[in-house]
Swiss-Prot record:
It is found in: Cytoplasm. It comes from Pectobacterium atrosepticum (strain SCRI 1043 / ATCC BAA-672). Pfam families: HHH_5, RuvA_C, RuvA_N. Residues 144-156 are annotated as: Flexible linker. Belongs to the RuvA family. One of its GO terms (biological process) is DNA recombination. Residues 1-64 are annotated as: Domain I. GO terms for cellular component: cytoplasm; Holliday junction helicase complex; Holliday junction resolvase complex. It comes from the Bacteria. This is Holliday junction branch migration complex subunit RuvA. CDD domains: UBA_RuvA_C.
Length: 205
């Protein structure tokens, strides 16, 4: 199993990053909240990974630290939550914000995430609350004061930012028309792709 990668960032195509380690390029799917924190292209990055094997694909999911990965692993144990939905959840909210929403039973905030209906939101609250008790680290301590719309720092520039941002939202589970609408509502001339994604996801909460 591949648990950690240390290598050079070759490409960024949200929510995927291509990282070269020992001459091999790995395509890694990352929550956007983790993606924002990546170094610039051609810089070294360390990513903690979770390897998923399916009948039709082998996928790597990446995170900035072990606690975020631990949360992802607990999420995909919840009935009805697969890796793609877990990725979307942790893109719409940071790991800390998600823990806070579950602890405060913020059903209204959870159902705004792509692919999360009321039943799934209720299931997340019931099942994840118990799972947090078995996890260690600052992420899973009391976080009741964490706002659900805290911004992330973004400074990477890409071409055709609006189209790429909409494509990234579709990859996270939004319908194409909905993704385009979300981007058009917050688009501005000086915004890069990652800024547009961040602002669109933040506005959806």
């Amino acid at each position: 199993m591949i648990g950690r990668l240390r290598g050079i960032i070759l490409e960024k195509q949200p929510p995927q990053v291509l990282i070269e380690a020992n001459g091999v390029g790995y395509e890694v799917h990352m929550p956007m909240t983790c993606f924002y924190e990546l170094p610039e292209l051609n810089q070294e990055a360390i990513i903690f990974t979770h390897f998923v094997v399916r009948e039709d694909a082998q996928l790597l999911f990446g995170f900035n630290d072990k606690q975020e990965r631990a949360l992802f692993r607990e999420l995909i144990k919840v009935n009805g939550v697969g890796p793609k939905l877990a990725l979307a959840i942790l893109s719409g909210m940071s790991a800390t914000q998600f823990v806070s929403a579950v602890e405060r039973e913020e059903i209204g905030a959870l159902i705004k995430l792509p692919g999360v209906g009321k039943k799934t939101a209720e299931r997340l609250v019931v099942e994840m609350k118990d799972r947090f008790k078995g996890l260690s680290g600052d992420l899973f301590n009391s976080v009741s004061d964490i706002p659900l719309t805290s911004p992330a720092n973004v400074d990477n520039r890409v071409g055709e930012p609006e189209a790429e941002a909409a494509a990234a939202l579709v990859a996270l589970g939004y319908k194409p028309q909905e993704a385009s609408r979300m981007i058009s509502k917050i688009a501005r001339p000086d915004a890069d792709c990652e800024t547009l994604i961040r602002d669109a996801l933040r506005a959806a909460l």
